[in-house]
């Protein structure tokens, strides 16, 4: 056995041992789901405005924010954002100030203030942050009403509520209620931010969108909006009642809305605006559920937007089985049991566009019962040995197949939620957040699941999905990944999915993708891509390689190249060097919630994807030796 193979086996053994030690008693794994400072800042604002005296929690949240502030006073959404981000800096500044632990006169606060003012002030922050500031009396509400009658119009209307994505809806409802009621939680302990912007605007277009949208043709959208505003007042009141019911019906057992901290925080404002007492059980439980999401990410206090328990457990269990751990091993069976218990069995919002399917999918977080998605479902189906729970497994597969979009691709949460009018909304990131279209990463990952499940390559749904991928390949040979960073992620998902479904190495799309991956490899054997790719919609290299992206690229190449190919061996060599399991290569965020706003560091990813790449390398090496 060569040195590289010995080192691979040694690293596999070490990683497997670590995962045995860190598995929870219920079979799950709990790794940090680390996003931006938004959650810490927003909870501080809410708690301080409510007069919540949980000083220890507020201090921890503020500590987490301060730890992310850079020496120049700015905050950024990802490490190589050299200039800083005005929205993140406003969030951090407002959160620190509202905590009562920092004053405007401190040097780091003065630096942040100067950066914000020099970048146009509060008017240039993302509209969700403007909303949060307005809900706390720190920014004026826009001269705009959002017609909540929108919630009660039937699906036959050209534009209706369920043509928005599920993650847009769950945030839109409390935001719209609070905005329409012009509700603000004002507390003298939340200092004014008037010094950051002397010309705060009520202009609805400036309030909702960025300047780059000025020249968009919105006439068709406004025509439908005008019709909504002409609906009788009684329907608007019905809309308010419907909004309240919509929120209350989607509260999870722990009190959170859809298990999201952000949506739950917004819901508290929405319910208060509707007259619900701050001392009511629903609000007390919502606050308790949100507070419980506080964790420690590398010794830094952080409020997770949700747990990632189902996702992490599914990915890790699959990676362990691929690394040679028997599916009878207690580590595997206990994780499978945990996952089986979280299969969703109720008809929820996904059924609006998919009314004939039986439930059976899985969601992302530990307590999610309302919001299954295709990515988690595909991951869980690969992570549960079919023989253990055959009925559950078949039900999950049936649900997943039913979620294929009419264009042949797969999206995250719902089916055929890609209406062109919604794309026209004058909101920042509407293209990313308001719709849920087919994506290359979801389509590739579902294909991988279907291929591993034994569906034949000529299965009509597989053929449609493969054709979707081929149609959506970029000119350079890559694929854009929506939920990971970014072109490396999309290309890995597409290639592994197509290989699992029998697409030949001689296919032009495969050849083109392999060429592209080789062309962007770094001299040290690594691959690294910036989060900026998601903003520019073109590949932007990092100045260094990351462990996770190198694992993606290496595994993608291994689908179609020999293990002794130079690009493969250099990539694997990078993965087995201990120094890459710390520092920037280890910690760079490679997940995406919302481009420009919410990048994610999944603390499980280095273990998941290095294991997968290394196990693929070892299995292919063994096959090549046999030949």
Which residue stretches match the model-derived regions?
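Preference for long, amphipathic alpha-helical scaffolds in soluble/luminal domains
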Residues: 1-627
């Amino acid at each position: 056995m060569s040195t590289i193979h010995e080192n691979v086996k040694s690293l596999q053994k070490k990683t497997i041992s670590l995962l045995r030690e860190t598995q929870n008693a219920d079979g799950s794994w709990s790794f940090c789901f680390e996003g931006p400072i938004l959650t810490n800042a927003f909870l501080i604002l809410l708690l301080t405005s409510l007069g919540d005296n949980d000083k220890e929690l507020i201090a921890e949240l503020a500590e987490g924010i301060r730890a992310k502030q850079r020496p120049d006073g700015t905050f950024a959404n990802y490490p190589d954002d050299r200039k800083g981000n005005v929205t993140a800096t406003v969030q951090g500044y407002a959160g620190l100030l509202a905590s009562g632990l920092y004053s405007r006169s401190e040097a780091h606060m003065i630096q942040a203030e100067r950066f914000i003012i020099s970048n146009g002030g509060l008017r240039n922050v993302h509209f969700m942050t403007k909303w949060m500031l307005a809900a706390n009396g720190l920014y004026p509400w826009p001269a705009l009403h959002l017609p909540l009658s929108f919630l009660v119009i039937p699906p036959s209307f050209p534009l209706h509520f369920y043509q928005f994505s599920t993650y847009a809806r769950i945030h839109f409802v409390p935001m719209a209620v609070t905005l329409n009621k012009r509700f603000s939680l004002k507390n003298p302990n939340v200092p004014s931010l008037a010094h950051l912007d002397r010309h705060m605007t009520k202009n609805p277009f400036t309030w909702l969108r960025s300047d780059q949208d000025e020249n968009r043709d919105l006439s068709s959208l406004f025509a439908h909006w005008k019709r909504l505003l002409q609906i009788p007042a009684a329907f608007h009141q019905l809309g308010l009642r419907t909004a309240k019911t919509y929120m209350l019906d989607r509260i999870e057992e722990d009190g959170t809305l859809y298990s999201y901290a952000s949506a739950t925080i917004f819901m508290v404002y929405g319910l208060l605006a509707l007259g619900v007492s701050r001392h009511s059980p629903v609000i007390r439980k919502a606050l308790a559920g949100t507070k419980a999401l506080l964790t420690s990410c590398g010794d830094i206090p952080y409020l997770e937007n949700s747990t990632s328990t189902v996702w992490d457990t599914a990915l890790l269990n699959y990676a362990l089985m691929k690394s040679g751990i028997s599916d009878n091993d207690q580590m595997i069976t206990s994780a499978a049991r945990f996952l089986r218990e979280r299969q969703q069995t109720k008809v929820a919002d996904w059924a609006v566009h998919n009314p004939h399917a039986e439930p059976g999918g899985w969601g992302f977080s530990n307590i999610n019962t309302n919001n299954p998605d295709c990515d988690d479902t595909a991951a869980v189906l690969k992570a549960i040995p079919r023989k253990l729970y055959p009925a559950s497994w078949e039900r999950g597969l049936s649900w997943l197949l039913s979620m294929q979009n009419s264009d042949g691709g797969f999206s995250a949460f719902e089916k055929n939620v890609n209406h062109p009018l919604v794309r026209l909304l004058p909101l920042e990131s509407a293209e990313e957040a308001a719709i849920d279209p087919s994506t290359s990463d979801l389509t590739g990952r579902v294909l991988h699941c279907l291929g591993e499940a034994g569906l034949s390559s000529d299965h009509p749904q597989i053929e449609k999905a493969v054709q979707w991928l081929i149609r959506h390949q970029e000119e350079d040979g890559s694929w854009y990944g929506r939920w990971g960073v970014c072109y490396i992620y999309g290309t890995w998902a597409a290639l592994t999915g197509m290989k699992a479904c029998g697409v030949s190495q001689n296919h032009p799309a495969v050849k083109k993708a392999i060429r592209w991956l080789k062309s962007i490899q770094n001299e040290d054997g690594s691959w690294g891509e910036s989060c900026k790719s998601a903003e520019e919609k073109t590949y932007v290299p990092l100045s260094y390689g990351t462990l996770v992206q190198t694992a993606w690229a290496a595994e993608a190449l291994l689908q179609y190249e020999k293990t002794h190919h130079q690009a493969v061996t250099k990539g694997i060599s990078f993965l087995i060097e201990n120094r890459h399991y710390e520092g920037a290569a280890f910690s760079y965020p490679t997940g995406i919630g919302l481009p420009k706003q919410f990048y994610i560091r999944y603390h499980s990813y280095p273990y998941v994807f290095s294991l997968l790449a290394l196990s693929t390398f070892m299995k292919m090496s063994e096959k090549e030796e046999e030949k």
